[in-house]
Amino acid sequence: MYKNIIFDFGGVVVNFNPRDFLMDHFMNRRAEEETYDIVFGSQEWQDLDRGIITREEANKIMLEKAAHANRVFEVQTCLDEWFTMLETNKTTVQIMRKLKAAGYRLYYLTNIPTDVMDELRQREWFSLFDGGICLLYT
């Protein structure tokens, strides 16, 4: 019988859908695609996920790319507001509460960067976890 359940954050406990975020903000397919490529689809975003670059370094490079593509406004908007797309997945949290009440121990395993992890620790559901591992902590 299982006693421990492991959850990821992005796309499980919190929603992460950059394309919807871009559509809600810009409603222009070309702007959305170019901005996606510069931010969420970039090597810098992957490097940030791997913990080999800081948010400041990644942002600087992305803004330089944005300047060349004439997308500074869009990219800066993403860099300033992307956290807002990390809405709590209420269904997952309900399941977590039921599992906890049934005696299961809950853990997280994630690669979310430090600044995001710090913000998630403030959410009311974070205390449901008995522990966890953040694979990077830059």
Regions found by a protein language model. Give the residues of each.
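Active-site neighborhood of HAD-like aspartate-dependent phosphohydrolases
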Residues: 1-41
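Helical cap/lid subdomains and adjacent loops of hydrolase enzymes that gate the active-site channel
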Residues: 31-48, 78-90
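A metal-dependent, Asp-based hydrolase signature
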Residues: 46-78
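Distinct, well-ordered alpha-helical segments
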Residues: 117-123
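Generic structural signal for small/hydrophobic residues in well-ordered secondary structure
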Residues: 8-11, 51, 108, 132
